[in-house]
Structure formats: C-alpha cells, structure tokens
C-alpha cells in the first residue's frame, strides 16, 4: 500500500508539471488514483510504443515473449489441412513479429498499429502487403467483410471493455472468418477485467466468453498459456479462437 501511495504522489507531481500527460494519466489510473478507463487512450498507446520501438524486439526476447507463436499456432490449428488463412489482418502489428509466421499462411497480409515508430520497424522487417497507422476499432469497423482471418497478439490487453473492439472485428471478418487473439489472464477471483499496475488489462475467462457471445462471435477454443516472463515470473494469458458464424446481435 505504501508503494502505491508513493507512486500516486509521483504521478500527481508529474501531472502538475505536464497536465494531461497521457502516460501519467494512465498509470495513475492503474495505481488507483483515477477511475479506470474502459481502454488505454490513443495518445498513451502511440507515445508509449513510439518511445521504445527501437528496443522493443530485444526487450521481448529477454522476456521470452511467446504470444506471436501462440496466436499463429492457434490460427493454424483452426484451419483445415487444405486451407490458407486467406486475407489476414495483423491487428496491432507492432514491429511485425507476427509477419514471418503469418506470411506463409496468408494470401494477403495487412497490418495496423497506432504507433508510427513501431510501423517503421514493421516496414523494415517486411512481409506485409499494406501497413496503416490507425486506431484498431475504428479501422476494422471501416472495412466490412474484408479479412478471412484477424490475428492480434497482445493488443487487446490495452482494452478493458472488449465489446466494441470485438464487434468491430466481427464487422471486418468475412463469413466464417477467424479471430485469434491473446489477452492476459485475470486472477481467479476477478469476474470481468482489471487494470493492472503495469498499465495493461487482464481479463477473466467468463468475461471473454460473454463478450464474444454478446457480439455474435462463436468461441471455438480458449487456452491458458504463458505469454512471457515479467519480474522473473510467468505472465499467464488466454489464447482465444472465435469464428464469425453470421450470428447477429444488437
């Protein structure tokens, strides 16, 4: 409790010097000093990832980051033996860590991210047919029935409320299209979502299941796995595969 009080004090001092600073506002909310937002702000995401785009891949290698491998393996398992992933969206593509894994499965591979710094790295890595700098929910909503598969590795952990982003994904998927994503797993006593002190959200399995059902996405599989290590401890998450079965919800 004392550490959190100290952190809130530091963050409030920061905001006095820089009113409206997106990082300070988000971290203060994660420390319990402000109401929890339903998702991280666009400004926080863009500034946070622009700041460490150059060191992003090296840092994640140290942490044993596995989310790209886990989500692409889940996509491959959901496809029938003769199917490709078709037209694929890498949703929150970052530096393009998924591209080398998705490219062999995809007829076309598009990427979208809010951070221009991360997109610059993705361009250098290659493998994409198109890269766009945009907010994910709005971007998907503007492209109805565009993709056969949407893959999102560790992007939805910056969303607490999942309804809008999942609804947009359903709009963007073709009929029978697949959505594969990872999120961090909340502790067993949590029934919805939680903004953690690290600034990322964690989600409970029942909440994920309810959110998918609410927008008319059919849950195919949900697996519990280790996404990476943090402070020498495994970070557990959910690997989710859902299908657009054409069910319509209000």
Regions found by a protein language model. Name each.
Residues 181-201:
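Short, glycine-/aromatic-enriched active-site segment of Class I SAM-dependent methyltransferases
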Residues 200-216, 222:
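Short alpha-helix
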């Amino acid at each position: 409790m004392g550490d959190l009080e100290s952190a809130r004090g530091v963050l409030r001092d920061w905001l006095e010097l820089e009113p409206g600073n997106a990082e300070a506002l988000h971290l203060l909310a994660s420390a319990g000093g402000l109401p929890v937002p339903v998702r991280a702000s666009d400004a926080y995401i863009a500034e946070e990832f622009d700041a460490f785009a150059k060191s992003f891949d090296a840092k994640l290698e140290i942490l044993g980051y596995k989310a790209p491998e886990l989500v692409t393996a889940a996509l491959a398992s959901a496809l029938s033996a003769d199917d490709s992933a078709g037209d694929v969206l890498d949703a929150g593509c970052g530096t393009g860590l998924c591209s080398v894994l998705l490219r062999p499965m995809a007829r076309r591979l598009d990427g979208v991210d809010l951070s221009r710094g991360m997109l610059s790295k993705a361009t250098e890595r290659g493998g994409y047919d198109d890269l766009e700098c945009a907010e994910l929910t709005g971007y998907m909503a503007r492209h109805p029935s565009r993709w056969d598969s949407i893959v999102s590795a560790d992007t939805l952990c910056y969303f607490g409320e999942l309804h809008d982003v999942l609804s947009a994904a359903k709009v963007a998927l073709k009929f029978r299209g697949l959505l594969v994503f990872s999120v961090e797993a909340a502790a067993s006593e949590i029934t919805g979502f939680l903004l953690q002190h690290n600034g990322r959200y964690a989600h409970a399995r029942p909440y994920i299941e309810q959110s998918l059902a609410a927008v008319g996405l059919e849950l195919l599989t949900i697996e519990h796995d280790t996404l990476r290590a943090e402070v020498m401890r495994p970070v557990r998450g959910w690997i989710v595969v859902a299908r657009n079965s054409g069910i319509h919800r209000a």
